[in-house]
UniProtKB/Swiss-Prot annotation:
Pfam families: T-box (PF00907). GO terms for molecular function: DNA-binding transcription factor activity; DNA-binding transcription factor activity, RNA polymerase II-specific; RNA polymerase II cis-regulatory region sequence-specific DNA binding. The lineage of its organism: Eukaryota, Metazoa, Chordata, Craniata, Vertebrata. Binds DNA as a dimer. Interacts with dscr6/ripply3. It comes from the Eukaryota. Keywords: Activator, Developmental protein, DNA-binding, Nucleus, Transcription, Transcription regulation. The gene is tbx1-b. Residues 119-297 bind DNA. This is T-box transcription factor TBX1-B.
Length: 463
């Protein structure tokens, strides 16, 4: 039986289909005649050193989903590993010769299209690597699919699992930039299944949008209690995608073999690593991952907003409230905005304007040109300046004009770290009855806190 499940939906699933039958027959359907076999992909760098994968017995591994074993490529007769039903502990060829089960019409016509296939192919040509950590690490590329052929009114559950490609452990040879077999595989990790958090849902909901498993995390912690997928480092794995029809019949366990359909994409196989081995994989991940901007070659002014942990909430406020006319459109702005919103959700930061005290503080820290939430009055009533404009000393400005807008988002240095010598933006007992002073050596601070519009009779100290 499954030792750990990454979603509370197991209880519901057990009412609709027998998990044991699902896990056992999932493997059988893959290795049956006409099914999927884990043979080397075209251009797979591993195939240079491993011309074929030897068939192995499922009993060698303790995976509740069995062990997906490939078919020999040396011209031998077709054979596949028999999947042992939990509790039986025996293997044989009967299940391999078993006639394929006729699928329920609710799942028979379902087809799945892998999103970002070109990117997956590019990684696969190099030999995809996925980082595993103790705390858990998300996959990149993210496993995303588009589903067709579902019954719009039927309920479905979507889940993923990972099976070893073979029973070998690998090492990376840096002198030849290739993977080599280092020996037999380590003891198998506990088999786990990741349920999509929206499961179960109607077919219409699944089909109207791309299904993304962006919450799935990989770990090498055998004692993990967060429901992450546990993998062995330096081993190869094949992700599998399963669609399970939620059968409302009371005796649905009798139809467990009919009510699911499994999809395997060869280009998504990968090697689990604790650190990237192939430098070309590292470069490709940096170039294609929208959240790896901090590792790219960029202007030095860009790095604080990507690496300073306290700058994200402030930058989000500027990004949401900035004047769209103040900066010209740039290529990829929509994609960057989507990635930033994704990162905001993932970072789980606290709301910026949760209480009045925070709003008061933000109204004094932010530029006077930015709208202040909660109906607060900006400190300056003078002519507002664009939120992205950084006023420089006239003596330091060169004659060469700036032909491009430097940054899409303001840097934390411009708006937070630039005015290092300004007075405190919050009230202090010693500050009474006078506005903020212009700083003769820091025009940016003078522009941020202008005393021209400060009310003369207002006391900034405690009342």
């Amino acid at each position: 039986m499954i030792s750990a499940i990454s979603s509370p939906w197991l209880t519901q699933l057990s009412h609709f289909c027998d998990v044991a039958a699902f896990t056992a027959n999932s493997l059988s359907s893959l290795n049956a005649s006409g099914g999927y076999h884990l043979s080397p992909s075209p251009g797979d760098p591993y195939s240079q050193h491993e011309p074929h994968y030897e068939p192995c017995s499922a009993s060698q591994h303790s995976y509740s989903f069995g062990h997906a074993c490939p078919e020999p490529e040396s011209g031998a007769s077709s054979s596949s590993c028999a999947s042992s039903t939990p509790g039986s502990g025996s293997t044989g060829s009967s299940s391999g010769n078993k006639a394929p089960v006729k699928k329920n019409p609710k799942v028979a016509n379902i087809t799945v299209q892998l999103e970002m296939k070109a990117l997956w192919d590019e990684f696969n040509q190099l030999g995809t690597e996925m980082i595993v950590t103790k705390a858990g690490r998300r996959m990149f590329p993210t496993f995303q699919v588009k589903i067709f052929g579902m019954d719009p009114m039927a309920d479905y559950m979507l889940l993923m699992d990972f099976v070893p490609v073979d029973d070998k452990r690998y090492r990376y040879a840096f002198h030849s930039s290739s993977w080599l077999v280092a020996g037999k595989a380590d003891p198998a990790t506990p088999g786990r299944v990741h349920y999509h958090p929206d499961s179960p849902a109607k077919g219409a909901q699944w089909m109207k949008q791309i299904v993304s498993f962006d919450k799935l995390k990989l770990t090498n912690n055998l004692l993990d209690d967060n429901g992450h997928i546990i993998l062995n480092s330096m081993h190869r794995y094949q992700p599998r995608f399963h669609v399970v029809y939620v059968d409302p019949r009371k005796d649905s366990e009798k139809y467990a073999e009919e009510n699911f359909k499994t999809f395997v994409f060869e280009e998504t196989r990968f090697t689990a690593v604790t650190a990237y081995q192939n430098h070309r994989i590292t470069q490709l991940k940096i170039a294609s991952n929208p959240f790896a901007k901090g590792f790219r070659d960029c202007d030095p002014e860009d790095w604080p907003r990507n690496h300073r942990p306290g700058s994200l909430p402030l930058m989000n406020a500027f990004a949401r409230s900035r004047n769209p006319v103040s900066s010209p459109p740039q290529n990829g702005s929509d994609k960057d905005g989507d990635g930033r919103r994704e990162y905001e959700r993932d970072a789980s930061v606290t709301p910026l304007h949760g209480d009045a005290a925070h709003q008061q503080l933000m109204s004094r820290v932010l530029s006077p040109s930015l709208p202040v939430p909660g109906g607060l009055v900006p400190l300056s009533t003078g002519r507002p300046s664009p939120p992205h404009e950084l006023r420089l000393d006239p003596h330091s400005q060169g004659s060469e004009p700036l032909h491009h807008h430097p940054y899409k988002y303001p840097t934390s240095y411009d708006h937070y770290l630039g005015a290092k010598t300004r007075p405190a933006p919050y009230p202090l007992p010693s500050i009474r009855g006078h506005g903020y002073h212009h700083h003769p050596m820091n025009p940016a601070a003078a522009n941020m806190y202008s005393g021209a519009g400060a009310p003369g009779g207002y006391e900034y100290g405690p009342r």
